[in-house]
Amino acid sequence: MAGKRVLVIDNGSYECRVGWSDSKEPDLRFRNVLTKPRKDRKKEAAASEGSASQTTVEQSAEIQVGNDITNIEAVRAHLKSPFERNVITNWNHQEQIFDYIFTKMGFDGQDKIDHPIILTEALANPNFCRQQMNELLFECYGIPSVSYGIDALYSWKHHQQKQKNISDALIISFGYSTTHVIPVLDGKLQLEHVRRLNVGGYHIITYLFRLMQMKYPVHLNAITISRMEKLVHEHCHIAVDYKEELVQWAQMDYYDEHIMKIQLPYNAVTATNAMLTAEQKQEKRRELAHRLLDIKKNREQEKLREDEQQLFVYNKLRQLYEQKKLDKFERALQQQQIGTLEDLDSLIATINSRIKRAQERAQSGPRPSKQQERLNKMPKPPEGMSQADWLAELQGKREKILGRKQARQQQRSEQAKRHTHAAQERMRIISSLAKNEKRRKANGEEEDDGFGMNDNDWDVYKRINRYNDDSDSDADNEKLMQFDKILNHYDANTDGNSNVPPQSAAENYQLHFGVENIRVPEVLFQPSMIGCSEAGLAELIAFVLKLFPAAEQQRLVEHVYLTGGCAQFKGLKERLIKELMEMRPFQSKFAIYESDEPTLSAWLGACVHAGEPTFGQTLTTRQDHQEHGREFFREHTASNIFYPTPKD
C-alpha cells in the first residue's frame, strides 16, 4: 500500500470533485447527474445493421455523464441522479458515474483500480448503503482499500490547518438537499446531538424558479433552472433584517435604484413596413389590389371555360332527345346523374345565364373592390397643397385637439378638489349671481337687464358648470377619429396612440430581479415560505446548543464554522451573528468562521487526511470486507460512527 497515490472522491449530490491527494485542486469537477438521450429511430435502424461489437460501443456511448452533457436544459426532463436527497439509492447510476470517473482519470481499459480511495458519504449513512458501496468498489472495481468520511468534517479538518489547537466547533454544513448542525467536542463528532434541516440549495433554486414563472408566465420557456442557478449563485444574498429590507423594497425610489433587469434572448423583428414612406405604402396597396383583381379575373375565366364545356355536353344530350335516340338519351342521363328532361333543361338555362353574366362583366370591365371603394372615398389633399404639407397640417390639428382634451381632463380633476383655485372661482361666481338682484321700475315691475342678448353672456354658465364640455368633447372626438383615419391611411409612421411612448422589444423580454434576491435564500431561516413545517436554521442552532451544559455551549459557540455551497451567500455571517447575539446570554462571546473555499474545502480536507501518518489505519481493506462483513468500515476523526446492524 505504501507509495501508492490516493484517489480522493468528494461525491456530493450536486457536484462531484475527483483528484489525487498530492494535487492542489481536483483534476475533475462535474455535475453529479447522467442522462440517456432519446434515440433516433432511423439511426437505431441503421445501427442494428452493423456488427455486434459496433453496437456495444454505441450503446456505451449513449449514456452522458457530467461534463459530457453539452446542453443540460435540453435533457433536463431526462436527468438522473444516484442520490435521493443526500443518500445514494440508485446503484446502477452510481456505477455509471464511477465508470466516467475512472475513465477520465486514466484507468480506461484496466482490469482493476489498484489505488486506495477516499470517498465522502452522507452523515449517518445507513449501513445498507455502505454495504452496497463496498460491494461495488471491492468486487466490481477491485480496489485495495477505501476510507469513508463526512464532507463537513473533512472541511473542518482543512480549516484546522489554519486554526491550530482547535478541538471544539459547531459546524453548520449547507448541502444541496439538507443542512446539518454538527457539534464537535474534543475533536469527536457528537452524532447523537446532530440535527438536520431538510432545506438546501436545491430548494432555494426551485423556489426562485417557481417565483419567476408565476411572475412572468409569458416567458415560461426562457425561465430555466440553469438561469435560476446562476442568479442564486451570483446575485442572491441573505438579509440581516429581513422585514426591514422588505419595507425598503416597498418604496419606489429604493426599488428603482436597486432593481436588476435581466435581458432574455429574443429575435428582433425588423419593421420594414414602418420604414416606408406614404407614397411607397400607397403604391404597395395599389399593387396588392391589382394582384387581387388579376386573381379574381383568372378564376372567372376558368369558371367560364368550365361552364362552356358543361353546356356543350348538355346540348349534346338535348340533341339525342330531339333525334329520338331515347335509349342513348336515358343512358347518358344516368351517367350525368340527371333525373328527367325537365332537370336537363333547367341546368342548361342556369348555365346559359351564368355564362351571359360572366361575358357582360368581362365587357364592362372589372368592378372596383370594396378596398378600392374605400380608397376612393378617402379624402384627398386640396388642390395646390402637397400631401406632406396636408398631413402635417392635419397632425397639427390633431395635437391641438389632444391638448384640449388633456386640459379638460386636468380641469375636471382640479374641480373635483374643494381647495383648488378652479373650485374657489366657481363658488365665487355662483355666490355673485345669487346676490345680484334685478332692478325694478317705478310701477314695481322688474326691469330687464338685457342678459342674454350677447352670446358671450352665456359663457358664465360654462364657467360654473363642472361638466360643460360634453358637447365640445364629442365634437373633438369625432374630429380626432377622422384625423386618425386619414393619417393612418396616408402616413405609415403615424400611430393612433402616438402620445404614448412605445415600448421596445428588448424591454418586453426583461425580468426584474428585485426582492427575490433576499426572499429566496430566506427559506433557510423560514422554511415555512416553501411549505416546510420544520424550524429554521436559527431555531435549529438554539435547539442543538440546549442539548449541552452551559460550559460546553460556550465552547461550541466560540468556533462556529460555516461550510458548503450555501455558505457563499453574502450576509450569512452577519445574519448568524445577529441570531446568536439574540439567543446567547448577555455579554457572552462567540465567533463565526467561514470556509475560504466552501465548495472545495471537503476535498482539500480529505487530501489532508490522506497525508496524515495514521492514514493507513483508517483504510478499510478487502480483507476487512471479507472478515468483518460487507457493511464494516474503520472509524476516524472525520468519519461516521460504526453501529453494526443487529442480527435477528
Swiss-Prot record:
Residues 34-59, 357-385, 403-455 are annotated as: Disordered. It is found in: Nucleus. InterPro entries: Actin, ATPase_NBD. Residues 414-428 have a biased composition (Basic and acidic residues). Keywords: Coiled coil, DNA damage, DNA recombination, DNA repair, Nucleus, Phosphoprotein, Transcription, Transcription regulation. One of its GO terms (cellular component) is Ino80 complex. SUPFAM superfamilies: Actin-like ATPase domain. Residues 277-311, 340-364 form a coiled coil. The modification Phosphoserine is found at S471, S473. The keyword Transcription applies. Proposed core component of the chromatin remodeling Ino80 complex which is involved in transcriptional regulation, DNA replication and probably DNA repair. This is Actin-related protein 5. It comes from Drosophila melanogaster. The gene is Arp5.
